[in-house]
Amino acid sequence: MQKNRNVVWILAGICICSLFLFLGESYFHTKGEPREAVVALAMLEKGNWILPVNNGVDIAYKPPLFHWCIAVCSAVIGTVTEYTSRMPSAIALMAMVMVGYAFFAKRRGREVAFVMALLTLTNFEVHRAGTNCRVDMLLSALMVIALYQLYKWGEKRLRGIPWIAILCLSGAFLTKGPVGMVLPCLVMAVFLWIRGMNFWRIFFSFFGVALASCVLPFAWYVAAYRQGGEEFLQLVLEENVLRFLGKMSYESHENPAYYNVVTVLAGYVPYTLLVLISLFALKYRKVQAKPREWWGRLKAYIRTMDDTRLFSLLSIVIIFVFYCIPKSKRSVYLLPIYPFIAYFLAEYILYLVRVHPVVMKIFGSIMASVSILLLLVFFSLRMGWVPDTIFSGRHAEENRAFMHALETVPLDVVSWFLIGAMLVAVKCFISSLRKKDVRMIHYDVFFIVFTIFLSLDGLFQPPVLNVKSQKPIAESIARIVPQGTVYSYQLNEVKGNPLRQFIVNFYLGDRVVPFYAVSPVQGYMVAEEVEIAVFKEEHPDYRVEEIPIGDYRLRLYQFKKNTE
């Protein structure tokens, strides 16, 4: 018991270091993060926690639980920041990892559960989602925890009421719509049916759970409809029905079926490489059985499969297949399957350590080389050994800006600590290579991967990503227009998916409003040079003057309508 408690504290410490230390180091640089954060900002500033209006005219595209979480985290310090906006995702990932460890430790052993937790935490897709201000990590955590709780309910033969599962399903519904409630129920229902439980008992039991899970979301939907009316109803239909049927009013992340396979393989970097290397170490037998015999063997294997393994397999297969159906596909939709893939991968890694340790040695050597290479490139940039002429083409100027950002980033105590941690991790791995007993070598490899992610979050990525951010533009505009509305003018407006100056709007405190929504007589407007040329053609009755704010693509203009 004491040993298990120590492992829990160690895992919690790893989660905190991996997720919370550098959440706010990178500015918002994509439209997705500030689009969610500004909804929470509108909630706090306008007091509307049901259906707040942001960007002057927009209502949120997703239900409000994620935005409520941001608002609660931000209310503690009195303002919405990059850190507080990303905090709900980090908390959700930590909860998913910790609950997953407890679930698998009880049923499959502490070691496989601990390795599973580390794999979940240190793969590219999950780590990125856990440090971003997007709804997907919260949705995935609630779905996965609901699956664990429904499994525990199934162990009790569906006796009692799974209150925690119902709350998680309600939360998932309030995060991104009914899919968050439907999929966990479907997975568990199929599992119990395969295990021989009566179909109608399963159906009515999960129908009751689904109804109970809809109570809180239904209350919000009613309140939101009273505020938003038909516009809100159309948005709900678009996001939850038409998106699944591929009949949205605009193209949204449309990708072929194989896209999901590619994204999972890419999302599990660096461990995809480990699996690829291991394929050369395995022994293969010639396949002689006919397809009908394969099917019979598969059914027999499933019948004899451990319950936890079958549950994990079904979670992967059903959720994966479900998200292959709609045209709209994104890598983050598949986040709920990552912990279950991690479980099977954990078993596989422990097998490799026992039977083919050379695979872990090769993989660890590659990761150690990547770590050293990162440091060599970083210090080469700082020494000025890389000339600007190395870059050419369309993005040459931006790439040079990235390089100079790394070249001039100040090295403080934290920076040197991160560099030292990378070197220590490599040293520990090299030491383990010299030992005859390699039963713990996988933890040295995890240490290297952990320090790479930590250094990327805290040292290498922020200066590069901050170059892409429009925060300096917003700060320049704020000095000239400290109060009042700033208007925006953008071309190629798409119905249902309008373009907005999300980053600038967030950093200006939700003061940016589309010009067409108000048609003001005078004021300030942000637009690109091409856009302002079109504006002048379409509105010849306006005088427009550029206000210098720096060498940016996005410009600030002062306009006034001619009254003569």
Residue ranges and their predicted role:
Residues 1-361, 552:
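Membrane-integral, polyisoprenol-dependent glycosyltransferases
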Residues 163, 284-564:
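Membrane-embedded architecture of ER/inner-membrane glycosylation machinery
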